[in-house]
């Protein structure tokens, strides 16, 4: 009678306030970032646990489980048996977990025996199976049930990539029968009042309760092996304690215990070809409560085609690499700690698992169908596993490519990391468990049932070999992960370079805008200076006009000229002011655009800095991981060196044994040396031939090494022939029985020698493989460390460049602000200057109006005095008084102007605009209209003024005509000069064109000469190369001819030697033994030829190994140099970061308020 008792974590524990949700580490490895917990959605697709981790869990569970785990909870099961009845039955879900893969048949047998030993034996009843009730799965368990469909679809995709690296597990997997798909548990879920998860059923439902039936012992054994799943191990190893807010504190115990009894002992069970399949299949863990549902058998169909994909030997499961998982943005620090805890599996936690057992939130009834009985074979599994282990040998690293070596290196690194974590866990297990943990695990009384356990351990060498083969399959994706990491880093570098280009473009644009603004300012300054010069010229012309002899004509002409000039100047000033306003508006719009672009640049710099900070954190984490890997790899390399020393000692022992065997062979051959007197003639002939060979070897020094080898072979052949001759003589004299015995002994010795040579070669290969693997591990770890250092240096350089650019942007900001201030100041100065000019022009217009009034008054006085001559006004009569009066007027005007200026300066008049009513034009007009009111006879004065103006107009027309004539003469002279200049320029251009044509001709001639020289040089080089090639070929031909002659001579000598030897043997031997002697000679010749071929192959291999060693040394020197450079660069980067940090600390307090600077300081600190 056997019973199954399970205490369940009914619902997933809710997290406490301020603490993250606890979850098992390997379950977190299974989940992808997309598969987030959501009660309102269906289960998302997740990645499966790696087969290697599954095997580690099973192995450590089998090794670390104690009998107390199964005894402590027996009474608790009985106390809770009828606590929570089930109310509602839901659809049944049938789904199978991915099959855990075993290392070998021996490993599967070991697991089976260990799990069977944990059961309680009760020989009275062997068929009664108690029913059990299941609680609903947590979200991680439900997602584990979703894996099988995804694994079946991805098995064929991954099979092609995994077939290349299949090792010992493939051979084991081929012996394993396909798993039975339908021999699974049926889970009948009872719906609670408030369900936590609403997932659709994954398989057909069956709510019928089967009756109790007899279960054979073989099925019980297979079922017990099938119950061991990775999630069950996690449930045993990790327990969670927390209190939900607003609810009671409930004890939750995650501990799975099984108690079974069957009549047969584990030693009597013999597993056949289908046993590994039954052992390898793992079903999702059951979370049981006390409510019981009866269980009955169900017929299990045979294996189908779909089961072929579940063979344990094939690595068809998908998994997520740690680096890709880290790149998805998971909290790496917590996950790494959980991963270390998951790989430790301490037995203390298994013995004292403390948790919270929830009350009856929901319950699930199940009808369990045990698997169909499997055929039991009589094959010896241990002999089969030993045969498989001896048949699978490690590959020769000399024949592998660089890619394969890198994959092997990555596999070994991960294996070393996992083994190091396991060693740490096993060391921690030796310590005494905590008293609270021991006390908290005792919820039930211990049962008196005795449990026996017979663990078996493989040898260390076999375990290491199996672990290496497993690591080869586990770590195939690390090469791809490193390539993805490098591609990501290259993409980040390209993004940074693009950012650099954009920043440089923006800076160039800002510089062009600043240069355009400076040009506009320079143009405005030039215009202002031209206006000043024009004002001075106008003043000078006015003074010259006032000093003229003809007062009236000169004044009118000067007035007209001055008025026209001033009007044109004012119009030009208006146009220039309008242009200036347009330019100012354009500059303002450009400044607004610059401001917006500057804001965008600031946002981009912030985003880039945040991205770089994230990249820096990820790189630091990766750096820590790699450092840990390197430390563990060094420790394991020390262990490997110790093992290699042991292997060398074993090899020395084998060599000593070989020497003993050689001594025995010498002893056997010593008693055959009595008959050497009969072959003294052959020795004399041999000495003569050796003398001839030595003479020819002195002549042919170039082939001395080859002739030495031929001599040694010849001497060996002579010795062998002598031995054989002696044997033949003895055979003729002695009986045939002695000959047969001698041949048997010789064959045995050859066999022993061959075996010793094979063992020696295998040992040498293994030692070389171990050395090469250790060296490759060291080199690749150094290369990875250097690459990480280079990446860090590049990222730091990009950070420095971004900081420099941010500083440049700040300086550009300051320059823009200064330019704005300069623009404002220039605008204010320009406005002030314009106001001053308008004020001066208004004063000048007032003075001109006063002068006109004085002229009119003077003319009226003259007209009153000369009433008789009022009809005709000659220009000569008015010229004399006009010359005297302007001088007085000039003096009076010059005296009045400062007083007027003094009177008008202190008045705070408002600033007049150009187009307003208070401008200079309106003031002049108002004065001219207001002045006649003071005169009594306005009409008379107007008439007189009109007549005077007409006369002045006539005089002005005459003057204009004379001026036009003078200007025409000047223009004609200018035209003639222009024509002369054009003719001279044309002549000069023609001369220049002729010179340019000559220069082009000369350049073309020079180009032709250069081309000819290059062609001649190329022809000479080709001829030299041809001559050198011909010389080399001729030298090679001479060497080949010499070699051919030497070879022909050696062949002839060998033929003569063989003929002489055959004749000597024929003369010495009887006619009955001649056929045997000839056959024996032919065999010896054939063997000598094969020996020569093998020696040549050995020399070639030796040269290849030397070349490989040279390459290895060169690569090692290069890598050491790169490491040194990376260390120096890292030091420089650290110094620069420290300097930047110090400079940022020395920034004044006004700049410290900037958020970006604060963020940089926090990041650097």
From Swiss-Prot:
PANTHER family: SPERM-ASSOCIATED ANTIGEN 5
GO terms under biological process: cell division; chromosome segregation; establishment of spindle orientation; mitotic sister chromatid segregation; positive regulation of intracellular transport; positive regulation of spindle assembly; protein localization to centrosome; regulation of attachment of spindle microtubules to kinetochore
GO cellular component, one term: mitotic spindle pole
Modified residues (Phosphoserine): 12, 14, 66, 161, 321, 333, 342, 946
Biased composition (Polar residues): 440-449, 876-897
Tissue-wise expression: Detected in testis, but not in the other tissues tested.
Function: Essential component of the mitotic spindle required for normal chromosome segregation and progression into anaphase. Required for chromosome alignment, normal timing of sister chromatid segregation, and maintenance of spindle pole architecture. In complex with SKAP, promotes stable microtubule-kinetochore attachments. May contribute to the regulation of separase activity. May regulate AURKA localization to mitotic spindle, but not to centrosomes and CCNB1 localization to both mitotic spindle and centrosomes. Involved in centriole duplication.
Region (Disordered): 1-23, 431-457, 875-907
Origin superkingdom: Eukaryota
UniProt entry tagged with the keyword Phosphoprotein: yes
PTM description: Phosphorylated by AURKA.
Subunit field text: Homodimer, with a globular head domain and a long stalk. Homooligomer; the globular head domains associate, resulting in aster-like structures. Binds to microtubules in the mitotic spindle. Interacts with DCLRE1B/Apollo. Part of an astrin (SPAG5)-kinastrin (SKAP) complex containing KNSTRN, SPAG5, PLK1, DYNLL1 and SGO2A. Interacts with KNSTRN. Interacts with RPTOR; this interaction competes with RPTOR binding to MTOR, resulting in decreased mTORC1 formation. Interacts with G3BP1. The complex formed with G3BP1 and RPTOR is increased by oxidative stress. Interacts with OSBPL8, PCM1 and CDK5RAP2.
Protein name as catalogued: Sperm-associated antigen 5
Location of the protein in the cell: Cytoplasm; Cytoplasm, Cytoskeleton, Spindle; Cytoplasm, Cytoskeleton, Spindle pole; Chromosome, Centromere, Kinetochore
Keywords annotated in UniProt: Cell cycle, Cell division, Centromere, Chromosome, Coiled coil, Cytoplasm, Cytoskeleton, Kinetochore, Microtubule, Mitosis, Phosphoprotein
Residue ranges the record marks as coiled coil: 509-856, 937-1146
Alphabetical list of InterPro entries matching this protein: Astrin (IPR028728)
Induction remark: Expression is cell cycle-regulated, with an increase from prophase to cytokinesis and return to basal levels at the next G1 phase.
Ranges for region Interaction with KNSTRN: 453-821
Chief location category: cytoplasm
GO MF annotations, alphabetized: microtubule binding
């Amino acid at each position: 009678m056997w019973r199954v008792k399970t205490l369940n974590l009914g619902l997933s524990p809710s997290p406490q306030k301020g603490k993250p949700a606890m979850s098992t580490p390997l379950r977190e490895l299974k989940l992808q970032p997309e598969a987030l917990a959501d009660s309102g959605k269906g289960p998302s697709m997740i990645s499966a646990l790696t087969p290697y981790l599954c095997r580690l869990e099973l192995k450590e569970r089998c090794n670390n489980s104690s009998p107390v785990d199964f005894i402590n909870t027996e009474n608790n099961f009985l106390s809770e048996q009828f606590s929570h009845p089930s109310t509602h039955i839901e659809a049944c879900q049938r789904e199978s977990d991915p099959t855990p893969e075993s290392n070998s048949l021996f490993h599967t047998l070991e697991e089976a025996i260990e799990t069977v030993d944990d059961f309680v034996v009760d020989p009275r009843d062997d068929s009664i199976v108690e029913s059990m009730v299941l609680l609903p799965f947590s979200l991680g368990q439900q997602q584990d049930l979703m894996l099988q469909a995804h694994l079946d679809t991805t098995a064929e995709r991954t099979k092609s990539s995994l077939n290349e690296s299949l090792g010992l597990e493939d051979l084991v997997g081929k012996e394993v029968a396909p798993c039975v798909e339908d021999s699974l548990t049926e889970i009948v879920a009872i719906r609670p009042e408030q369900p936590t998860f609403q997932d659709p059923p994954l398989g057909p439902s069956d709510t019928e309760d089967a009756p109790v039936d007899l279960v054979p012992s073989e099925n019980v054994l297979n079922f017990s092996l099938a119950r061991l799943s990775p999630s069950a191990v996690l449930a045993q190893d990790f327990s969670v304690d927390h209190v939900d807010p607003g609810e009671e504190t409930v004890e939750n115990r995650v501990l799975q215990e099984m108690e079974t009894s069957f009549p047969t002992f584990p030693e009597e069970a013999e597993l056949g070809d289908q046993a590994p399949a039954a052992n390898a299949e793992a079903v999702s863990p059951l979370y049981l409560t006390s409510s019981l549902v009866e269980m009955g058998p169900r017929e299990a169909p045979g294996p189908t085609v779909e089961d072929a994909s579940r063979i344990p030997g094939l690595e068809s499961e998908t998994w997520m690499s740690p680096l890709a998982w880290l790149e998805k943005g998971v909290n790496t620090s917590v996950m790494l700690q959980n991963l270390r805890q998951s790989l430790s599996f301490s037995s203390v936690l298994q013995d004292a698992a403390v948790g919270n057992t929830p009350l009856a939130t929901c319950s699930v009834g199940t009808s369990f169908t045990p698997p169909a009985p499997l055929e039991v074979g009589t094959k010896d599994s241990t002999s089969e596993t030993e045969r498989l282990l001896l048949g699978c040998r490690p590959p020769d690293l000399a024949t592998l490519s660089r890619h394969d070596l890198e994959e092997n290196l990555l596999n070994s690194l991960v294996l070393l990391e996992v083994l190091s974590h396991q060693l740490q866990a096993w060391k921690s297990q030796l310590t005494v468990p905590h008293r609270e943990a021991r006390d908290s695990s005792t919820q039930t009384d211990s049962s008196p049932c005795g449990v026996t356990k017979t663990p078996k351990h493989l040898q260390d060498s076999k375990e290491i070999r199996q672990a290496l083969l497993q690591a080869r399959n586990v770590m195939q994706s690390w090469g791809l992960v490193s390539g993805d990491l490098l591609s990501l880093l290259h993409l980040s570098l390209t993004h940074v370079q693009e950012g650099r280009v954009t920043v440089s473009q923006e800076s160039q644009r800002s510089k062009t805008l600043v240069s355009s603004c400076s040009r506009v300012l320079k143009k405005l300054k030039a215009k202002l200076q031209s206006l000043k010069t024009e004002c001075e010229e106008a003043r000078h012309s006015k003074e010259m006009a006032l000093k003229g002899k003809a007062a009236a004509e000169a004044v009118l002409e000067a007035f007209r000229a001055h008025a026209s000039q001033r009007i044109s100047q004012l119009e030009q000033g208006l146009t220039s002011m309008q242009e200036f306003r347009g330019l100012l508006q354009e500059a303002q719009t450009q400044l607004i655009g610059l401001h917006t672009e500057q804001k965008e640049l600031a946002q981009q710099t912030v985003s880039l800095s945040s991205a770089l900070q994230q990249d820096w954190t990820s790189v630091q984490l990766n750096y820590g991981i790699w450092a840990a890997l390197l430390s563990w790899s060094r420790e394991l390399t020390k262990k490997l060196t110790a093992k290699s020393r042991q292997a060398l000692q074993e090899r020395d022992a084998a060599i000593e044994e070989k020497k003993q065997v050689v001594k025995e062979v010498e002893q056997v051959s010593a008693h055959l040396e009595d008959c050497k007197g009969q072959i003294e003639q052959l020795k004399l002939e041999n000495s003569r031939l050796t003398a001839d060979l030595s003479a020819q070897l002195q002549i042919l020094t170039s082939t001395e090494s080859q002739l030495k080898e031929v001599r040694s072979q010849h001497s060996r052949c002579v010795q062998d022939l002598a031995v054989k001759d002696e044997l033949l003589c003895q055979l003729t004299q002695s009986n045939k029985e002695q000959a047969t015995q001698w041949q048997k002994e010789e064959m045995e010795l050859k066999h022993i020698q061959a075996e010793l040579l094979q063992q020696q070669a295998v040992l040498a290969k293994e030692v070389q493989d171990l050395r090469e693997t250790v060296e490759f591990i060291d080199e690749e770890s150094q290369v990875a460390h250097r690459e990480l250092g280079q990446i860090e240096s590049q990222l730091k350089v990009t950070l420095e460049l971004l900081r420099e650019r941010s500083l440049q942007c700040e300086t550009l900001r300051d320059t823009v602000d200064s330019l704005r201030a300069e623009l404002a100041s220039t605008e204010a100065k320009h406005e002030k200057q314009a106001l001053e000019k308008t004020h001066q022009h208004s004063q000048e217009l007032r003075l001109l109006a006063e002068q006109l009034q004085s002229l009119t008054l003077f003319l009226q006085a003259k007209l009153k005095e000369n009433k008789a001559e009022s009809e005709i006004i000659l220009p000569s009569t008015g010229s004399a008084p006009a010359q005297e009066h302007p001088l007085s007027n000039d003096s009076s005007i010059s005296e009045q102007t400062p007083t007027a200026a003094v009177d008008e300066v202190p008045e705070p008049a408002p600033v007049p605009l150009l187009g307003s009513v208070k401008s200079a034009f309106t003031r002049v007009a108002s004065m001219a209209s207001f002045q006649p009111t003071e005169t009594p006879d306005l009409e008379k004065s107007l008439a007189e003024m009109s007549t005077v103006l007409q006369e002045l107009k006539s005089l002005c027309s005459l003057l204009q005509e004379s001026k036009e004539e003078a200007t025409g003469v000047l223009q004609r002279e200018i035209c003639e000069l222009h024509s002369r200049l054009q003719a001279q320029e044309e002549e000069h251009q023609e001369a220049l064109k002729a010179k340019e044509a000559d220069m082009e001709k000369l350049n073309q001639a020079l180009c032709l000469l250069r081309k000819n020289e290059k062609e001649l040089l190329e022809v000479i080089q080709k001829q030299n190369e041809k001559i050198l090639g011909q010389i080399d070929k001729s030298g090679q031909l001479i060497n080949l001819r010499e070699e051919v002659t030497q070879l022909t001579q050696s062949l002839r000598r060998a033929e003569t030697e063989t003929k002489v030897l055959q004749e000597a043997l024929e003369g010495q031997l009887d006619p009955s033994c001649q056929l045997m002697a000839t056959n024996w000679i032919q065999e010896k010749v054939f063997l000598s030829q094969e020996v020569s071929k093998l020696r040549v192959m050995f020399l070639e291999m030796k040269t290849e190994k030397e070349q490989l060693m040279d390459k290895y040394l060169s690569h090692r020197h290069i890598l050491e140099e790169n490491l040194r450079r990376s260390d120096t660069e890292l030091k420089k980067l650290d110094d620069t970061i420290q300097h930047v940090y110090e400079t940022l600390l020395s920034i004044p307090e006004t700049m410290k308020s900037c958020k970006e600077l604060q963020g940089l300081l926090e990041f650097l600190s």
